[in-house]
Swiss-Prot record:
The lineage of its organism: Bacteria, Pseudomonadati, Pseudomonadota, Betaproteobacteria, Burkholderiales. Mg(2+) binds at N272, D281. Nucleotidyltransferase involved in the post-translational modification of proteins. It can catalyze the addition of adenosine monophosphate (AMP) or uridine monophosphate (UMP) to a protein, resulting in modifications known as AMPylation and UMPylation. Pfam families: SelO. It comes from Burkholderia ambifaria (strain MC40-6). Its EC number is 2.7.7.-, 2.7.7.108. This is Protein nucleotidyltransferase YdiU. Coiled coil: none annotated. It catalyses: L-seryl-[protein] + ATP = 3-O-(5'-adenylyl)-L-seryl-[protein] + diphosphate; L-threonyl-[protein] + ATP = 3-O-(5'-adenylyl)-L-threonyl-[protein] + diphosphate; L-tyrosyl-[protein] + ATP = O-(5'-adenylyl)-L-tyrosyl-[protein] + diphosphate; L-histidyl-[protein] + UTP = N(tele)-(5'-uridylyl)-L-histidyl-[protein] + diphosphate. Keywords: ATP-binding, Magnesium, Manganese, Metal-binding, Nucleotide-binding, Nucleotidyltransferase, Transferase. ATP binds at G109, G111, R112, K132, D144, G145, R195, R202, D281.
Amino acid sequence: MSFSRSAADAADTLPDLAATLGAPALGAFVTLGDAFHTRLPAAPLPAPYVVGFSDEVAQLLGLPASFAAQPGFAELFAGNPTRDWPAHALPYASVYSGHQFGVWAGQLGDGRALTIGELPGTDGRRYELQIKGGGRTPYSRMGDGRAVLRSSIREFLCSEAMHHLGIPTTRALTVIGSDQPVVREEIETSAVVTRVSESFVRFGHFEHFFSNDRPDLLRQLADHVIDRFYPACRDADDPYLALLEAAMLRTADLVAQWQAVGFCHGVMNTDNMSILGLTIDYGPFGFVDAFDANHICNHSDTSGRYAYRMQPRIAHWNCYCLAQALLPLIGLQHGIADDDARAERAVDDAQAVLAKFPERFGPALERAMRAKLGLELERENDAELANKLLETMHASHADFTLTFRRLAQLSKHDASRDAPVRDLFIDRDAFDAWANLYRARLSEETRDDAARAAAMNRVNPKYVLRNHLAEVAIRRAKEKDFSEVERLAQVLRRPFDEQPEHEAYAALPPDWAGSLEVSCSS
């Protein structure tokens, strides 16, 4: 059986998928051994149906565009093979540990996620397929192993939206729903979302083996990550120190991109940090609407630890946790016989690497903000100009996405064209004062207004996944109308295009959107 076979014989081939996705098709991670995962079948999801499907991700995986319409598709990605899983093809849940809200939480793991296979991508990479909501695992703790329709749709939509914003992320192939009830803050229905990524290894995987005093397994994991994803680190003087630096730099770049589009992750625990620098684990995330630097998207985050302005600091802190976990490996190649001396040097080397985080993050964010302001030339006070705009937006609660999008309409010479963006500010005088500074800075640029506007519209999205847009799609999906999930997904594929036929998706949020809350209860 092969995914590439025609739809005509799909009824015969899809039930056999479980028999073909065994080792080595489950991927390299499963070969690390039983200490890294537990093999088990998914719990059947009754009467599954397709809620959403990304033909782009299917194409990436070499699957036909008609794949979702083939018989057995919903059963397959609900984790319900029509035949028993053969032993060699059993999915797996991986074990990891981590810090949650800054506190050591001990062993965690894939409590409701199962990796069901790995496929070669059309881009030459290999991608793991992981179903979230596949039932209880040994790492479920008090959970039921299920995901709900609400959170599954949000993850599906945002994974693809972030990709089209150019932000590193896991992808999402499909959402499968079911009428099976589950209890959260209220009674909801079950769903399964299929995530796609080169790897789902997290900072917490390294923390797990460090905390359990297993340097042998820690090294095995690090070697796996280096050999498969960071091969250049193998040639470094210290491969494990190089791994720390490479992962840290990707993390700094990622969070700079988050800040530039007003994205809040919501739960930046170390077990939710990808070793590849990807946005992973979409839970109580949100894009900032009315700008507030202290915006908290997760109503479970009562202390504001993961507020918008805190994300860079938390990312840096999480890198310290990764560094601590890698300390037993750093400096091994130096041949220092004295363990205390080697450990002391490892700490010094790790701290030197960690000191580079702000050196990477700051310039990355400055470049992003310069582009958002349409500034082609680099000037010393550009960061100050950008920060002053954010302060003015904060004071007026101006809409984040629309402010930057409408700035493209501002003229270098004609203040009468300021109205579209100016009207977003309560304090118009404060905006006018900033706009005068901005115009003075634009006078140093060589591009005309049209060229600058075109450049700004390529980096300032018109469309992002605002909470109220997702909520409308979710409410309709609960009534078995999935057209809004599809429509919204299509709009978010082209976030920088005008799409005049979809203007309503770029409007300010309605008043009722202010009462929406998202939390970890998914």
